[in-house]
């Protein structure tokens, strides 16, 4: 019998496999139950291991999972790459709804001939039921960006002004939304901006902008940073 007990541990753990895809129903391989403050997963079928063999077994498969795809550009961290991310909720309504231990999530999508094709994978941490799951699947092929610093001024004692322009290019035949993520620093304050933005934390802002098909979109902003002297 094969059992997996998952708990948060202070030492490195093994990674386990999950699959998220579109298509028909998936056969159930593991049953799950609570065990003290942990979760016990039991393999519902037999499996054979040869001498010194290592085998990967998919712990959980879910099909037709509704996901939201995001294109994210962070020029300071990733150069010209626009990252492709997926997010979904680990709920029964989404075809999931079970505690997920730390592991690898592989994503598949049907092609025009209804064959499942592997589109990417990412690691996830321990995920509770109804938590949101975010996956980074790679970089967009037809979308890119460039981040340019257009101004850097010491405006006054302890006051610095920096301006940036972000140029997004879309070679797709359809328009798309791109999230521009910027870090303005702990003491930064945005004083000018070309497009509305959301302040995600004390140091991070995000612009959500539309980039036309076969076109480009420019985003600019100015941030003032004050240094406090003792």
What do the PLM-derived regions correspond to, one by one?
Residues 1-230:
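Long, intrinsically disordered, low-complexity accessory segments associated with secretion
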């Amino acid at each position: 019998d094969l059992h997996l007990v998952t708990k948060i541990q202070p030492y490195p753990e093994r990674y386990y496999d999950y699959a998220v895809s579109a298509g028909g129903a998936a056969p159930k391989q593991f049953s799950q139950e609570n065990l003290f403050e942990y979760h016990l997963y039991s393999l519902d079928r037999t499996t054979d291991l040869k001498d010194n063999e290592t085998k990967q077994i998919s712990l959980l498969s879910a099909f037709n999972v509704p996901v939201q795809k995001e294109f994210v550009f962070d020029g300071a961290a990733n150069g010209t790459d626009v990252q492709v991310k997926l997010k979904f909720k680990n709920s029964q309504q989404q075809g999931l709804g079970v505690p997920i231990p730390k592991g690898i999530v592989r994503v598949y999508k049907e092609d025009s001939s209804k064959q499942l094709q592997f589109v990417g994978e990412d690691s996830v941490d321990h995920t509770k039921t109804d938590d949101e799951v975010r996956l980074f699947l790679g970089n967009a092929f037809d979308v890119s960006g460039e981040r340019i610093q257009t101004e850097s001024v010491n405006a006054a004692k302890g006051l610095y002004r920096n301006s940036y322009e972000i140029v997004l290019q879309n070679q797709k035949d359809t328009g798309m939304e791109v999230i521009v993520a910027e870090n303005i620093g702990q003491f930064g304050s945005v004083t000018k901006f070309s497009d509305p933005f959301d302040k995600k934390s004390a140091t991070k802002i995000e612009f959500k902008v539309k980039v036309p098909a076969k076109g480009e979109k420019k985003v600019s902003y100015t941030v003032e940073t004050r240094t406090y002297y003792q």
